[in-house]
Amino acid sequence: MNLTKFNLLFSSVLFSFALAIYFFIIVPSDESARLWTRYSAHLSFLYLIAAYSLSILKDTLNLDAINNLAINRRYFGLSFSISHSVHLVVLIYFFYTSNENPGIVSIIGGGLGYLLMYAMTLTSTDAMVKRIGTKTWKILHTIGINYLVIVFFYTFAGSMVGGSLYSIYTVYVLAILIIWTLKIVKFAKS
């Protein structure tokens, strides 16, 4: 199966709902909402890190496989938006059913992240790029994606420090650090 725009977007919907089916029908428990929240964030991160890293990996490695993935970079971003919108619904459900409250930092920091994500989503067409101008579009998308990656980095680094060094969070943090290093090196050379 070829990686197409439709396949990417459909996968974000399919995997988001597959998580719900798994946690609530296949292996239901008192922790289902918490686990669904956690794993929907993991799913979102995979789409985000792909969208974030493809251009620098294409420039650095120039491999056919990466070049082919980079063609659909916009759709990795839109798939992130879909899966992270499901994550937002899951978070609301979790806080509603658990009677826990999110912290003010999570509300403000996460809220800003969602605003930026939706602004990027709404401007992810060629027509919108023309309408708002390439320079404005580039500023919005550069600030937006970097902010989102920083939020994930902060969250994962905190989970890594609070848990085991041998966790998936360590892999995520290292992946972000590697991509940042490649971007800094490219910037320094230009």
Give the positions of each predicted feature.
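Membrane-embedded alpha-helical bundles that constitute the cytochrome b-like, heme-associated redox core
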Residues: M1-S190
